[in-house]
């Protein structure tokens, strides 16, 4: 996404990037720029062409570990979050994530709040993600316009904002720059983001900031 089209920068929002580790080799400047902006990088397999649930247990473990190691080498920091390509896991994925180092995973799209998972006696957090407020299924697959997508974002926010008055809610807006970042769409996203950040009490946070806050709250579920 070109800097002049980057709504998050204008509105003081830092993103959490689902990063294929191959990007560290193929497009290192992208990774360097994200780090310089203070954005968070979470593991997203080595490539979107790889799906963990189709691998042998040995290959899956190797991919999870190699992904985290390559991102750490490129950024100096082990990724704290993970999103599997296609949100596809095997029965072993969570065990390998605990071994590799991430503290949260975004594959489980079943709640609007974080929650803890017991993985072999170790703690791993689930963080809210969305396949609804997501430009790929809505714009590319369902053929919705950017204005329709903006209305979806606003309605999602309004509901979660009301509910959040009693107990905090997490709203994920899941984007792909090659979709939302084109000239005829970016204005709709910018408008939606401006609407959200001007509401009182909204906290634009990265994935790890959300999880740190959740754990510090004393939550046990």
Q: What are these model-derived regions, one by one?
A:
Residues 69-73, 77-167:
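Active-site-adjacent pocket scaffolds in enzyme catalytic domains
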Residues 4-13, 71-77, 163-166, 196-201:
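A structural motif corresponding to the C-terminal end of an alpha-helix
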């Amino acid at each position: 996404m070109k800097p002049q089209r980057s709504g998050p920068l204008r509105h003081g929002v830092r993103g959490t990037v689902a990063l294929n580790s191959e990007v560290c080799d193929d497009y290192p400047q992208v990774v360097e720029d994200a780090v310089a902006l203070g954005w968070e990088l979470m593991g997203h397999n080595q490539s979107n062409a790889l799906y963990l649930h189709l691998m042998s247990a040995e290959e899956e473990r190797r991919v999870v570990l190699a992904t985290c190691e390559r991102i750490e080498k490129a950024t100096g920091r082990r990724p704290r979050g993970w999103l599997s390509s296609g949100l596809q896991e095997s029965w072993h994925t969570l065990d390998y994530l605990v071994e590799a180092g991430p503290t949260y995973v975004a594959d489980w799209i079943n709640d609007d709040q974080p929650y803890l998972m017991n993985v072999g006696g170790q703690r791993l957090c689930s963080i809210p993600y969305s396949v609804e407020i997501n430009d790929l299924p809505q714009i590319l697959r369902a053929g919705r316009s950017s204005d329709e997508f903006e209305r979806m974002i606003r309605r999602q926010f309004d509901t979660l904002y009301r509910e959040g008055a009693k107990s905090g809610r997490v709203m994920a807006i899941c984007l792909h720059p090659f979709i939302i970042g084109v000239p005829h769409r970016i204005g709709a996203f910018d408008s939606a983001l401006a609407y959200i950040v001007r509401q009182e009490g909204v906290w634009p946070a990265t994935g790890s900031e959300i999880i740190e806050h959740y754990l510090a709250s004393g939550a046990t579920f």
